[in-house]
């Protein structure tokens, strides 16, 4: 797979050139990727190893599982190992496990039942490794525990059941809260906080010394309820009356859940409500909680106003219960992302600091902030962005992180000293590549993961020497050999420049047997949401996009374009879409389509666009422009009107309806001419059990188009019974991708001009579809 292909863009594009390396998947064989190899998920894909590092006196230790299921304590450097849990002590059918910090016990989750994107219910058991005894966390548990977590320093477990918080300690359980129920959540988030704020299933945090627990309480009283019917409900025979799931789901401008901040003394079970005054109760979102001490002296929370364009970091002194705003920011030029990146680092030149990422300068960078408030210290700077903090080594005074310093599509690993501010690459940062790393508990070792664009691999390094690996962890040599049997799509990365001066990143896939003298259909595949990124130097998944590029009967060229509003190109580029989602993004997709048509090989009669979720919304908004460039489109699980989506996501970018009524009206898909004038077809796909983007969006969109005069030969709506946002219920994804494949095949076969019809056929079509049949 040459990573620079025949662009033939006549100077309109600037290539992003990765180096040629021996591990580049150049193919060289004659096999073409098949449908079954790519759909519904890629079967030819790289392997990777994820280690559960253990914090112990000896660095570089981790837990692995042997072939027979036993849990092994291994030292990655010395290759020594010790069996901690024999195979016959491992519960059958377990879902996950967590070791007690001193390795004397294991907490097991069994009887897994999925709830939302991250949350689930389960039974939990504690295995005493020395005694070999297995004890239920709760004697009467019935697969109903929502979350459980070991304390970092003692024998305690905090867990949540029926939305109430409990503390287990050496076999004894203390119920901490008594008010948990359908509308009150203690220590776990409700739906909207799980989905849009934390991206996780817990809302409790032990202090580093294990003596205190900070947790949040959410109150959904008054939050409107959305009802989702489940027609089959996983039954062989559908119930006469569908099961109805009622979710407190705050839509735009509706009442949000309120949130309270609490502290619990583990030893005394004394619980304290800390007043939150950063913003009024109905204008408050708590986005992050972090302990700002090595013991339990200070804890902080990140507070946003409702529309998340103002931020306050509030420190709470645990003993006095006093609160203080130690940092605040006005981000009304756009929005403020919740990066969940606060981390205590301790004393620096006589003052206590924590580290955080902020894009207040216009670019996301690492700063040191005084725990008690005061002027920040910038550790990184420049017109590039820090993506994530990987590890803080307080002994060496180093922060390890990934960034886009080379290019917005790349990731390289660096360290920066918060003593000297010297920044050091741990990889070759002069190549177009995509790296991340996983550091051992004490930071002495790390697994470097090269993730693309060539065949991924993983190597072990010592932080004392980033030049020479200690060993290879995952080679993917078998994948490299297998790829030699194939002719693969030709992938290239480049930029196109907008008339306004911004550049857009593009990922292009050309058919394996590409001939510049032939005509090819083109499919655009955007996501395009705020802060997202699709165009990156990460491994090119051999998925549906690669399939439609490879199949000789399809041979689509695909373009993935990251429009304005997407991530890692600075705050100005991101914030351009604020208060008008779908407007600039659609303009950029249209501009890119006009650019692709400057290539002689691009077939102007067969230019499609397909996206899922926000990409489905963007597909509809792009067709709505009536540009005449796109000839067909597919929206999978789309938002069609952001007034129908949840408040905490939408208002971050659009504000409330009261503040931006005209913006919401324009953002909704409401103009039908672009759909009526399509040369080809428009397909909508949606799961009826989608708890994220409700099926209501597809129903409203379909109705808007039908009532607006879009004829039946132009529009198909496909629902998937009981499927969620990922369309996975009852093999629905299999049907979904077959339908997608048929759609792109039919559109390629569609002729620009309809064949002559008998007068009788014309009369029938005129009666069915209106005047268009007479054209």
UniProtKB/Swiss-Prot annotation:
GO terms for cellular component: extracellular region; plasma membrane. It is an enzyme of class 3 (hydrolase). Its main location: secreted. The active site is at residues 613, 690, 725. Its EC number is 3.4.14.5. It catalyses: Release of an N-terminal dipeptide, Xaa-Yaa-|-Zaa-, from a polypeptide, preferentially when Yaa is Pro, provided Zaa is neither Pro nor hydroxyproline. Glycans are attached at residues 81, 111, 154, 219. The keyword Kinase does not apply. It is found in: Secreted. GO terms for molecular function: aminopeptidase activity; dipeptidyl-peptidase activity; serine-type endopeptidase activity. Extracellular dipeptidyl-peptidase which removes N-terminal dipeptides sequentially from polypeptides having unsubstituted N-termini provided that the penultimate residue is proline. Contributes to pathogenicity. This is Dipeptidyl peptidase 4. It comes from Trichophyton rubrum (Athlete's foot fungus). The lineage of its organism: Eukaryota, Fungi, Dikarya, Ascomycota, Pezizomycotina. The gene is DPP4.
